Amino acid sequence: MVDMSNVKLRIENIVASVDLFTDLNLEKVIEICPSSKYNPEEFPGIICRFDDPKVALLIFSSGKLVVTGAKSVDDIKRAVYKLIEMLKKIGAKFTREPQIDIQNMVFSGDIGMEFNLDAVALILPNCEYEPEQFPGVIYRVKEPRAVILLFSSGKIVCSGAKSEQDAWEAVKKLLRELEKYGLIEEEEEW
């Protein structure tokens, strides 16, 4: 059985879609958003950056948002409620709680062992490896849906997960497959 205690995962980015359930006047919104850009000829929304929490928000007149760059779900919530408080100052009315949906979480990690990627690519199903184009194996997990980039050093990037639990489950599935096909060496006891 694969030992998961050596595996480390760290959140690098979370992307969420948000519905504030109210229309916004972007001409007014741009006035209250520091560190923001609005050029409706190029893009139909405001690009706004917060330093605390450190995130970027795409704000649309429909009251829909995209929040990216967060390192935690709590950061997403703090950014949304910070924006709501700013919007109230320009007369925006809110009749219900915002709907926040996590769309993607990106994790970096280390499995704690090295891999021969040529062997992995030959034996492991659901993977791609084009070393001339990219130095890692691309492994696709169907359930939970995620993509894991596996590098020869044992470093990984997991994207597409909607929760930390999904990311861990995807990594477990990869490790089980690697073990099943004999691509993980059992550590010898001395």
Curated annotation (Swiss-Prot):
Sequence repeats: 11-87, 102-178
GO molecular-function term, one example from the UniProt record: DNA-binding transcription factor activity
Key words of the record: DNA-binding, Repeat, Transcription, Transcription regulation
Residues that span the membrane, as ranges: none
SUPFAM superfamilies attached to this UniProt entry: TATA-box binding protein-like (SSF55945)
GO biological process entries: DNA-templated transcription initiation
Entries under InterPro entries matching the protein: TBP, TBP_archaea, TBP_CS, TBP_dom_sf
Superkingdom of source: Archaea
Keyword Transcription regulation: yes
Record bears the keyword Transport: no
Pfam families per UniProt: TBP (PF00352)
PANTHER family documented for this protein: TATA-BOX BINDING PROTEIN
Function: General factor that plays a role in the activation of archaeal genes transcribed by RNA polymerase. Binds specifically to the TATA box promoter element which lies close to the position of transcription initiation.
Cross-referenced NCBIfam families: PRK00394.1-2, PRK00394.1-3
Family the entry assigns: Belongs to the TBP family.
HAMAP family: TATA_bind_prot_arch
Protein name (database record): TATA-box-binding protein
Organism: Thermococcus kodakarensis (strain ATCC BAA-918 / JCM 12380 / KOD1)
